[in-house]
Amino acid sequence: MNWNKGGPGTKRGFGFGGFAITPGKKEEPKLSQQSHSAFGTAGSSAAFAKSGPPQLPSFYKIGSKRANFDEENAYFEDEEEDNSNVDLPYIPAENSPTRQQFNSKSADSDSDDDPLEAFMAEVEDQAARDMKRLEDKDKEKKNAKGIRDDIEEEDDQEAYFRYMAENPTAGVVQEEEEDNLEYDSDGNPIAPSKKIIDPLPPIDHSEIEYPPFEKNFYDEHEEITSLTPQQVVELRHKLNLRVSGAAPPRPGSSFARFGFDEQLMHQIRKSEYTQPTPIQCQGVPVAMSGRDMIGIAKTGSGKTAAFIWPMLIHIMDQKELEPGDGPIAVIVCPTRELCQQIHSECKRFGKAYNLRSVAVYGGGSMWEQAKALQEGAEIVVCTPGRLIDHVKKKATNLQRVTYLVFDEADRMFDMGFEYQVRSIASHVRPDRQTLLFSATFRKKIEKLARDILIDPIRVVQGDIGEANEDVTQIVEIFPSGPSKWNWLTRRLVEFTSSGSVLLFVTKKANAEELANNLKQEDHNLGLLHGDMDQSERNKVISEFKKKGIPILVATDVAARGLDIPSIKTVINYDVARDIDTHTHRIGRTGRAGEKGVAYTLLTPKDSNFAGDLVRNLEGANQHVSKELLDLAMQNPWFRKSRFKGGKGKKPNIGGGGLGYRERPGLGSESSDRGNNNSVMSNYEAYKPSSGAMGDRLTAMKAAFQSQYKSHFVAASLNNQKTGSSAAGASGWTSAGSLNSVPTSSAQQNAANPDSPIAATAAAKGVPGFTSTGTLSSVPTFPSVGVQGYSNNSSANASAGNREGVGSAGSAPRGGSSGGGGGGIVRERYSDNRNSRHNEVPRRGEGGGRYNDVQHHGEGGGRYSDAYRHGEGRHGDSHRHAEGRHFTDTGGGNRNNVDGRNISEGRSNESRNGENRKDANSRDNKTDGFAVPEPPKRKKSRWDS
């Protein structure tokens, strides 16, 4: 900072503006022309600020903003001065060191303003700081002493627990999928859509040259050959076998007659087989003969061994496998468990010939199965889908297959494997040998199976789908579901003491719930259902076979093919979806002749299944409790189709319709079955209630066929009780109608003084007559002098009139015309023994349902007309008319007694008409046409 002494052209003071040292007139400092100081302006301003009123200095004209000293702007003076100080940049003088430094800094600032370089600089700084921090940590660890890393560091278990604590929802995806499962109307889970397995493409076998092979190895034993056809039939009947097909081989009754070699016989004896089962007796000769077969037998009957033993002989006759060859025998089954079980049987018997077997099923390792197939195996036990996958991936081929077996074929068709099964069969050479085995075989599925067989022999042991008689079935009925749980917990310890217990549940969710509840009761058990991993399923089944766990809770996935001899009790906690599944369920016990017990727990809502269960029990000669039968009777289809027990029903001899006592529940207030006092003791005269409704006959039949049509009161003077059968008082019938009004011949009843009808007829003058017309043909009662008349509304019998009707001018079948002397005709309304008119409750001597009854009219009984004094069923008892002779030559011709003519003095035998005539009968005359004018009668309630 320079000091200016003042002088011409220069101001006195420092370079920043100067101020007066001594009081007096202020002088403006004079700026040096040679140098420029930054303090000049500030100094000048400060000097002026300390002095009196502001004045405009002369040096303030260069490079500065002129200050506003107006009074109105005095308020903003300080702010503007501050702004002026801030806004004015510092510019050093040219060629000064400060200017040079300023220029160099501005150049540096221009380079630092690049944003990318600034960002990279920050990144590098942060990285440097991080590296330094890591180095510090490493130094701290190196300096630390006495610390074990294996304790301080996190091991696998701690890492797992930490992960589960941080992720509590890990592994819950499966449960969510289970909740999304859909169920059908029966409550069975609908399997989620899996990978669709396309069938194998078609193949043209004509382009492939197959080597010849032999498939008939059966040399019939001489003892079997010596049997006569009758003895063969008796042997099959003894074994409960039904064989159909072209020239089936004869059955063998022992292993020695099968022609097995010593190696196989040794293995069979080692497996503790003593005698072949019935299906083996017939199935082994058929399979060894090279014939295609359909084998149907109950569960546990030895079907597996029946096709494994001939298969081994079939394989040993062919040349050994070469590298790249496929199997010789293929066994296809529906489930993984059955696949593994058959595979173990094949290994057991196949080791006698060093034959290799491979199990190929879904859920197993694809790579391991493919490797085993490529190494070569004579026997492949598989499920359809996985075999197709391996064939498509060239892991194996079916060119050498000559022995093809479908076990549980109906189950595969039911599961939707029909196209896969057909494609597998179409890929095997056409001249193969094919065998189908199952416990049940429906007609539709059997037709599908016959399409892949050639001239098959069908072997049925027992009834198709019947239950095993070695299994004792016990049905328990409970009022509700919780009652089943109480019963199970109370009896389960008892069941486990006798052997392993298999509990079947329909739904997978119910199986898990039941298993959890039993575990809370401290029961050791296993769980098996379709959604479990294959390794878990294998582990559970293995433990159950080894008796490691005494109880297994399973769905129907374990219902087929599971062969565990230790199972002594099967409990159907939930009923099966159909009777075939029930048959397979209970077949898990009682295997190979062993005895077992199967419990089925029912509730009232299971009435639909109860009907099938009743028939299943009856087919297996099992006891059917009354409670179960009552529950089954709640099902309408079972109640309608159930056979009717009790005594057989007698035919309806009288006309159907009016004249029958009303059935209880169909209009009558009470049943008179227990009361032997007839209401006919009260009536005063005949009151037949037939109205003029001939044109409405069809409507009357439909509307009133099962209801009471008319009431009659006794025409007796002394109110005597009338019986239910006496031949003298025959009833008249309005043929074709619903009415049956009893009448009587006066002379006929007069001949029998013991009959109360005689007195009634004598008093009232009632002859017998026949009306074969409509309801309008109403009988009236002329004097006794009139012998009888017959009124035919039609030329012959009407639609309801049966053969042999004694009508005037028409001769009945087997006899002369019934015109004239008291022709009494009975017509049956219908020859159907089961018609609703026949099912009328009656009361008679026996008091039973089918005994004779007294109706509201003389002779209104079904089989007789007055007192019955004998044992004749159709009113053919001893009669008190003179010289009467009748013989029923029809025997069982009970429905053809409609047109019965009974006349005095005629004796005739007719098989159908049963015309009865007295010895005093007159010849056929035309006086039957002389119908007297009927007197007026009281109006009936049926008259329109």
From Swiss-Prot:
Compositional bias, Basic and acidic residues, is annotated for: 131-149, 825-887, 901-926
**EC top class named in words:** hydrolase
| Low complexity composition-biased segments | 35-52, 723-737, 794-814
Region Disordered, annotated ranges: 1-119, 131-155, 182-203, 642-682, 723-753, 794-944
Q: What CDD domains does UniProt report for this protein, alphabetically? A: DEADc_DDX42, SF2_C_DEAD
SMART domains, alphabetically?
A: DEXDc, HELICc
Residue limits of the Helicase ATP-binding domain?
A: 284-459
**Where, by residue number, is the motif DEAD box?**
407-410
Motif: Q motif; annotated at: 253-281
Q: Where in the cell is it found?
A: Cytoplasm; Nucleus
Name the residue ranges with Acidic residues bias: 70-84
Function as written in the Swiss-Prot or TrEMBL entry: ATP-dependent RNA helicase that binds to partially double-stranded RNAs (dsRNAs) in order to unwind RNA secondary structures. Unwinding is promoted in the presence of single-strand binding proteins. Also mediates RNA duplex formation thereby displacing the single-strand RNA binding protein. ATP and ADP modulate its activity: ATP binding and hydrolysis by DDX42 triggers RNA strand separation, whereas the ADP-bound form of the protein triggers annealing of complementary RNA strands.
On subunit structure and binding partners, the annotation says: Transient component of the SF3B subcomplex of the 17S U2 SnRNP complex.
Specify the protein name: ATP-dependent RNA helicase DDX42
What species is this protein from? Gallus gallus (Chicken)
